[in-house]
Amino acid sequence: VTTPRERDETSEVLDDHLVRQVVPARGQPYEHRCPRAAFEQIAHAAEELGEQGFTLESLLEYERTAGRDVTFTNVAVALAFLRERSILDVRYRRNHAATTSVHLDAMTEYHALAENG
């Protein structure tokens, strides 16, 4: 049984931003951006929360409670990239650290993407 594709998603680094590009099966392509500084902060938070597990919303609340200015879109873009690169696993609808060094692995993948595409 062949299922129709829902969408194609790619990531790249442009102008010091992680860019998530989406081409849906129907509708117009779109993209969302996450500045490098926000990505790095989100990676730190994911490392801090990764053992207990977290949702997009709980990470966003964690960051805002700490007085850091990140947006829902920033968190969504960063988490999608971290899951795509197997730095986070999803279990029971919660993100969990898949590595012992989430921040280091996240930044390594970010810079590798920036250099190599």
Regions found by a protein language model. Name each.
Residues 1-44:
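Long, low-complexity, charged/polar intrinsically disordered regions in eukaryotic proteins
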Residues 30, 43-51, 77:
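Short basic-aromatic helix/loop recognition motifs at nucleic-acid
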Residues 49-66:
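Short acidic, hydrophobic short linear motifs in intrinsically disordered regions
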Residues 60-64, 76, 105-107:
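Short beta-rich binding modules
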Residues 67-84:
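Short amphipathic alpha-helical interaction segments
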Residues 83-94:
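A short, conserved structural fragment
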Residues 94-102:
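Minor-groove-contacting beta-hairpin "wing" of winged helix-turn-helix DNA-binding domains
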Residues 102-117:
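Short, amphipathic alpha-helical interaction segments positioned at domain boundaries
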